[in-house]
Amino acid sequence: MSGHNKWANIKHRKGAQDAKRSQMFTKLIRELTIAAREGGGDPESNPRLRTAVENAKAANMPKDKIESAIKKGTGELEGEELTEIMYEAYGPGGVALLISVVTDNKNRTAQEVRHVLSKWGGALAESGSVSWNFERKGLITIPKEEVEDIDELMLLAVEAGAEDLDENTDPLEIITAPENLTQVRNALKEAGYTVSEKLTFLPKTTVKLSDEDAEKLLKLLNALDDMDDVQEVFGNYEIDDEVMERLAANI
């Protein structure tokens, strides 16, 4: 599993333990609104919104709150003026980071991001110096125990438009072009697989971190995750699973 996705899973578990429901709901509501504003209010034709709705339901967000957030994105209801920004940064060990934020105050958020990066061994980067190393992709995951024939799954996924399948992860990861995410997801669901999906940024090259730099980076990622305006952080780091689990337990 890539470093980013492994950390995302650990972060999800931590979030449930920390019970930061208010902050979590704020982030989910903003993602619903931005996703609807970007691609329309129909989850079936808008994969980003579909993922946002699934995440909101998984967090037990009331249906009326989900619908209200979507309508604010489509303009059916008035809402706060939100801006989506992608900051480029470097972290410990030379790791490249993309920091996705949604904010109602760009100046405040820029100062907060800069402060957190500086405190934990990172720094903002010039525009383009980090983003070149990432590609926008669709990511579908399937529980490994559901798959009896990996070759059959791979053939089905490729015929539906997938680019790659990583069988060395659990859950299995299937990569698609963003525009093919929906059709691949539909083909897999029709075949009876349990799928989770999202749009993500995947690195073209990765950096293997020492234990020391890995610990610094996870502290930085944790601090960024704790910011109200930060939606997600993408990185090109590699950390051994055992090391990440051990370090994350102490953060």
Curated annotation (Swiss-Prot):
Give the region (Disordered) as residue ranges: 1-22
Sorted UniProt keywords? Cytoplasm, DNA-binding, Transcription, Transcription regulation
Q: Which InterPro entries match?
A: Integrase-like_N, TACO1_YebC-like_2nd/3rd_dom, TACO1_YebC_N, Transcrip_reg_TACO1-like, Transcrip_reg_TACO1-like_dom3, YebC-like
Query: Which GO MF terms does the UniProt record name?
Result: DNA binding
Q: Per the record, GO CC terms?
A: cytosol
> Which family is annotated?
Belongs to the TACO1 family.
Q: What is this protein called?
A: Probable transcriptional regulatory protein Pmob_0807
Provenance organism: Petrotoga mobilis (strain DSM 10674 / SJ95)
